[in-house]
Amino acid sequence: MKTYRRQLREKIIQALYTLELRDVDTDSAANWLLTKEIMDDPNAMKFFNHLMQSIVRNREEIDRYIAKHTFNWDMSRIAIIDKNILRMALAEILYCEDIPPKVSINEAIEIAKKFSSTDKSSKFVNGILDAIFNDMKAEGRIKKCGRGLVDHSEQKMQKTENNR
């Protein structure tokens, strides 16, 4: 069974797609897509609204990261779905402190497999997100707490190497 957050992420991708194609506001796009069950769940709405607003408010910054890592691609040439999957994952990495970056990247890859028009989209999304994540980590841009702390396995590997 899909995780509840996966369903919310999929709804966010659909809402972003709607915003790209129609002259509607964020609330209208969300209202068309969200089920009563989701709208009645305060935790679901908190996650949905926080992530959606993070994408909308920080779109220019997020798009700069994408443009920097898509050397041979003009932003207008990237498929709308792929672009929005990248935006969502980057917003999650940057603005959802309790979600591990690897989870955000893996969720984006799975959503790309489901929604994108080609089999190559998930590989494209994976490559771009991995490169951006590595740069963000090097720049100290990743701020995580609790469950969202940056990959404990990397810390364990480093300790193991230091003990040799």
Curated annotation (Swiss-Prot):
Signal peptide (residue range): none
Matching CDD domains: Terminator_NusB (cd00619)
Pfam family, one: NusB
Entry's Gene Ontology molecular function annotations: RNA binding
InterPro entries (UniProt xref): NusB-like_sf, NusB_fam, NusB_RsmB_TIM44
HAMAP family documented for this protein: NusB (MF_00073)
Protein family per UniProt: Belongs to the NusB family.
Entry function: Involved in transcription antitermination. Required for transcription of ribosomal RNA (rRNA) genes. Binds specifically to the boxA antiterminator sequence of the ribosomal RNA (rrn) operons.
Protein name in the entry: Transcription antitermination protein NusB
Lineage: Bacteria, Pseudomonadati, Chlorobiota, Chlorobiia, Chlorobiales
